[in-house]
From Swiss-Prot:
Diterpenoid pyrones display various biological activities and FDDP C shows anti-cancer and anti-HIV activities. FDDP C also shows inhibitory activity of 42-mer-amyloid beta aggregation that is involved in the pathogenesis of Alzheimer's disease. It comes from Macrophomina phaseolina (strain MS6). The active site is at Y77 (proton acceptor), K81 (lowers pka of active site tyr). Its EC number is 1.1.1.-. It comes from the Eukaryota. One of its GO terms (biological process) is terpenoid biosynthetic process. Belongs to the short-chain dehydrogenases/reductases (SDR) family. NADP(+) binds at D23, Y77, K81. Keywords: NADP, Oxidoreductase. Pathway: Secondary metabolite biosynthesis; terpenoid biosynthesis. The gene is dpmpH. The lineage of its organism: Eukaryota, Fungi, Dikarya, Ascomycota, Pezizomycotina. One of its GO terms (molecular function) is oxidoreductase activity. This is Short chain dehydrogenase/reductase dpmpH. Short chain dehydrogenase/reductase; part of the gene cluster that mediates the biosynthesis of diterpenoid pyrones. The first step of the pathway is the synthesis of the alpha-pyrone moiety by the polyketide synthase dpmpA via condensation of one acetyl-CoA starter unit with 3 malonyl-CoA units and 2 methylations. The alpha-pyrone is then combined with geranylgeranyl pyrophosphate (GGPP) formed by the GGPP synthase dpmpD through the action of the prenyltransferase dpmpC to yield a linear alpha-pyrone diterpenoid.
Length: 203
């Protein structure tokens, strides 16, 4: 549990993108569309996440006593990544409604050779990360495409709110990750959580 009363996973991967929304819109220029890129893989996500209350952000995804297990850690990681997909889609809907020129994209960089990837896997299979996963430079290709590809700026409507599963490859995420009601719930629940600690203004 973090100092502000929520799990570190929820704070770092769910709440942080919500806090950046104001920074994002404050630097917009009609001549410089701004892209919000959310790096997201949801392979381990639970299908029970509704994000209706702040407690849903802190769900340990495990029975009491098993919170530190590799399976529970993988589920929490996947849930936070699914939240990024939901957040990116909800941000796009809101920016479109407000007439703000942002292209919000979520993506799955694939299995990348990092310590973080190894940490969410059971101990016995962690060597597979270093043997078979992509090098970080290769794993960054999807993120670089989302952030810099000219075709995204030229064909905005095609890419808005999209989910990339490789450079230039649009894919539908899981049914829950594309559920607009769950995305709406996540937005409001996260907003309430960050307002409660005084990070967002009350206006």
């Amino acid at each position: 549990m973090s100092a502000i009363g929520h799990s570190p996973t929820a704070c770092s991967r769910c709440s942080r993108p919500r806090l950046r929304r104001k920074d994002l819109t404050s630097v917009l220029s009609p001549r410089l569309p701004c892209f919000k890129v959310s790096s997201s893989g949801e392979a381990f996500a639970t299908d029970k996440a509704d994000f209706i209350t702040p407690k849903d952000l802190d769900d340990p995804c495990a029975s009491p006593g098993w919170e530190a297990s590799s399976l529970a850690q993988a589920k929490r990681y996947g849930k936070s990544k699914m939240a990024n997909v939901l957040f990116a889609a909800e941000l796009q809907r809101r920016m479109d409604a407000e007439g703000v020129d942002i292209i919000s994209i979520s993506l799955n960089p694939g299995p990348v050779k990092t310590q973080g990837a190894a940490d969410v896997l059971p101990f016995m299979v962690r060597p597979m990360v270093w043997l078979f996963f992509k090098d970080p430079a290769e794993g960054a290709q999807t993120t670089l495409f989302a952030a810099a590809a000219a075709e995204i700026r030229e064909e905005k409507e095609r890419w808005k709110g999209g989910y990339l599963d490789g450079p230039g490859k649009l894919k539908s995420p899981s049914p829950r990750a594309r559920d607009p009601q769950v995305a709406y719930n996540l937005w409001h629940t996260t907003e309430s959580a960050v307002r409660a600690i005084g990070v967002l203004d009350k206006s």
